């Protein structure tokens, strides 16, 4: 076993700058040439090791040998972009006005489909925030023509068609309109199967692609949506093998790869830009495309400033000295900026990245590095919420505690600007519950105890950290959340409980083998097998995946139900955070090992602009 030397943090973090400050105050360093994009190679090993934190009093510890930070601070600080120039913003503003006019120029034969296509295009291109009124007007118009058989292409259509109906079902449902999936029954044949030909024409394939996308926003007990997903999935898998490589084949592959719950809006925008000219041949797609590229690159310039701020925070806080923890702050920022591109929401993006990084640091301390005595002291210190509580902590914990304390308080200050009241008590309660759940897991590891599935699952909803990653970031948004509404979003509300449960289950299916190798035996898989003697790992995974599928439908309902009084934007941000976590777990544990998918996401959505 290897000996690993760990340099402790200073007793107090070196935070000389505001942790959440206006990005306009950040002064990025400049280079005349954009540096070649690169990352450090990562060949992670997850082995049991010994380490010493004190040269006099050696302590045996478990560590995971996570690979180091892939994105050097010097490299981050050297990034530069020309897209801060006012001329780009001025051109974008002119195009916004021209695109608004496009919402009005539609004929009676296909005006319903054209309106839906316009809404879908501006959303998929990531420019919908400029057209809120136009989108609402377009969808109100479509909904006024909706009936029990769906809709046709235009207001004068006498027959409903599957393509328009499926697109409308999905789009209207995502915007909170009360539409029933029963309309899909009208597109089945006499044998109860969705009617289609054996030829697989382009029009039919597009209809089935929209049917597939609609099926992903299913609510509980919608049998027709389950049937639609099964049928369209089979159909599209066969179709994509037969048709030539084209914009249509790429859209099929993208949608089947990412679906809805793992799709990231900025990633989709980057992907869709290459195909949308072919997707909207009957509209002036060039204007939409130019606007989308300008907006992408203008936001790219803001991303660089925010990323430099975050990298300085990480460096100045002393995290680089903690060699036993994962350093994923750049990846977390990337995920945040893939779901929120509003320039006013810097505090949300930076706050999410910082909260997630703190969660990761504490996860590595509680699960592997810290001793039981140290963890008890740290848990008590969090509950005291006072810098003097660090007196009895080991040196490396003092620095971590102070970064947590100062970051949470700084974010509470940002939240006060939006909410008009002090919200620190919400945050403290969330952190206390979170740290208690970690302590319970540490006790299971120390004692070798394996809890029941239910006990592990309920505690795991809290220890996953979803509440921490959501609460303070959404409080910084420009949407007031009074106490009674906030209670419907935060744990243990139905909405938050479903999200936390889904992520705990999904995370365990990706992490349980590596966790077990580190001596962390408890997981949803092992607890299920222990509760059900004779059950195999495959049985446990099948059971958990079935649970996730059903919980996702319930979560869809909690998110999209029309009669909810919680602001849609707040629920949407909370939902989008589940999407970024899902995305990281799509192929494997992308948070312990920054795989190629995550690296490419950083490059294509943050570091590289799109060619104009």
Curated annotation (Swiss-Prot):
Q: Its Enzyme Commission number?
A: 4.2.3.108
Q: In which pathway does it act?
A: Terpene metabolism; oleoresin biosynthesis
| Xref: InterPro entries | Isoprenoid_synthase_dom_sf, Terpene_cyclase-like_1_C, Terpene_cyclase_plant_C1, Terpene_synth_N, Terpene_synth_N_sf, Terpene_synthase-like, Terpene_synthase_metal-bd, Terpenoid_cyclase/PrenylTrfase
Cofactor dependency: Mg(2+); Mn(2+)
Q: How is the cofactor bound?
A: Binds 3 Mg(2+) or Mn(2+) ions per subunit.
So which domain of life are we looking at? Eukaryota
- UniProt subcellular location: Plastid, Chloroplast
Which Pfam families does the record match to this protein? Terpene_synth (PF01397), Terpene_synth_C (PF03936)
| GO biological process: one example | diterpenoid biosynthetic process
Q: Which GO terms describe its cellular component?
A: chloroplast
Binding-site positions, Mg(2+) 1: 363, 367
List the keywords (alphabetical): Chloroplast, Lyase, Magnesium, Metal-binding, Plastid, Transit peptide
A GO molecular function annotation here is: magnesium ion binding
Catalytic activity, reaction form:
(2E)-geranyl diphosphate + H2O = 1,8-cineole + diphosphate
Q: Where is this motif: DDXXD motif?
A: 363-367
| Enzyme category, top tier | lyase
Per its database record, what is this protein's job? Answer: Terpene synthase (TPS) involved in the biosynthesis of monoterpene natural products included in conifer oleoresin secretions and volatile emissions; these compounds contribute to biotic and abiotic stress defense against herbivores and pathogens. Catalyzes the conversion of (2E)-geranyl diphosphate (GPP) to 1,8-cineole.
Of which family is this protein a member? Belongs to the terpene synthase family. Tpsd subfamily.
**What protein am I looking at?**
1,8-cineole synthase, chloroplastic
Which organism does this record belong to? Picea sitchensis (Sitka spruce)
Taxonomic lineage of this organism? Eukaryota, Viridiplantae, Streptophyta, Embryophyta, Tracheophyta
């Amino acid at each position: 076993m290897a000996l690993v030397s760990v340099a402790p943090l200073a007793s107090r973090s070196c935070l000389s700058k505001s942790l959440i400050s206006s990005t306009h105050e950040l002064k990025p360093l400049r280079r005349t040439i954009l540096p070649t994009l690169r990352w450090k190679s990562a060949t992670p090993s997850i082995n049991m090791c010994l380490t010493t934190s004190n040269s006099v009093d050696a302590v045996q510890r478990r560590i995971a040998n996570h690979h180091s930070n892939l994105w050097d601070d010097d490299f981050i600080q050297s990034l530069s972009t020309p897209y801060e120039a006012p001329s780009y913003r001025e051109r974008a503003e002119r195009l916004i006005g021209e695109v608004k006019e496009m919402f009005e120029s539609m004929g009676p034969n296909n005006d319903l489909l054209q309106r839906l296509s316009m809404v879908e295009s501006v959303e998929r291109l990531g420019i919908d925030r400029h057209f809120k009124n136009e989108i609402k007007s377009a969808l109100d118009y479509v909904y006024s023509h909706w009936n029990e058989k769906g809709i046709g292409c235009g207001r004068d259509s006498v027959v409903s068609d599957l393509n328009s109906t499926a697109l409308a079902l999905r789009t209207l449902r995502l915007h909170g309109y009360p539409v029933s999936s029963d309309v899909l029954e009208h597109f089945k044949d006499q044998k109860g199967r969705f009617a289609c030909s054996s030829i697989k024409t382009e029009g039919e394939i597009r209809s089935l692609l929209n049917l597939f996308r609609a099926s992903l926003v299913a609510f509980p007990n919608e049998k027709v949506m389950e049937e639609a997903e099964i049928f369209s999935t089979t159909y599209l898998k066969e179709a994509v093998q037969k048709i030539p490589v084209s914009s249509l084949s790429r859209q099929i592959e993208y949608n089947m790869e990412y679906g809805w719950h793992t799709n990231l809006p900025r990633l989709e925008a980057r992907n869709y830009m290459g195909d949308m000219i072919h997707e909207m041949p009957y509209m002036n797609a060039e204007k939409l495309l130019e606007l989308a590229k300008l907006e992408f690159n203008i936001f790219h310039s803001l991303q660089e400033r925010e990323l430099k701020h975050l990298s300085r925070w990480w460096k100045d806080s002393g995290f680089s000295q903690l060699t036993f923890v994962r350093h994923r702050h750049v990846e977390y920022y990337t995920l945040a900026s893939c779901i929120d591109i509003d320039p006013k929401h810097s505090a949300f993006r930076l706050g999410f990245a910082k909260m997630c990084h703190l969660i990761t640091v504490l996860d590595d301390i509680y699960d592997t590095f810290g001793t039981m005595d140290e963890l008890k002291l740290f848990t008590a210190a969090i509950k005291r919420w006072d810098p003097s509580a660090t007196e009895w902590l080991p040196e490396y914990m003092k620095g971590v505690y102070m970064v947590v304390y100062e970051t949470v308080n700084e974010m509470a200050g940002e939240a006060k600007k939006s909410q008009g009241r002090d919200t620190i008590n919400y945050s403290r309660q969330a952190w206390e519950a979170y740290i208690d759940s970690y302590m319970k897991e540490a006790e299971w590891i120390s004692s070798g105890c394996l809890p029941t599935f239910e006990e592990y699952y309920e505690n795991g909803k809290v220890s996953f950290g979803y509440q921490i990653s959501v609460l303070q970031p959404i409080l910084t948004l420009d949407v007031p959340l009074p106490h009674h509404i906030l209670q419907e979003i935060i744990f243990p509300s139905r909405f938050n409980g479903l999200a936390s449960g889904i992520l705990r289950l999904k995370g365990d299916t990706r992490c349980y083998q590596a966790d077990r190798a580190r001596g962390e035996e408890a997981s949803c898989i092992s607890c299920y097998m222990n509760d059900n003697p004779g059950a195999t790992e495959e049985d446990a995974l099948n059971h958990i995946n079935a649970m996730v599928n059903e919980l996702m439908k319930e979560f869809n309902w909690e998110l999209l139900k029309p009669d909810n009084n919680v602001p849609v934007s707040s629920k949407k941000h909370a939902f989008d955070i589940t999407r970024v976590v899902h995305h990281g777990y799509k192929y494997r544990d992308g948070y312990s090992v920054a795989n190629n998918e995550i690296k490419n996401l950083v490059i294509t959505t943050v570091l590289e602009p799109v060619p104009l």
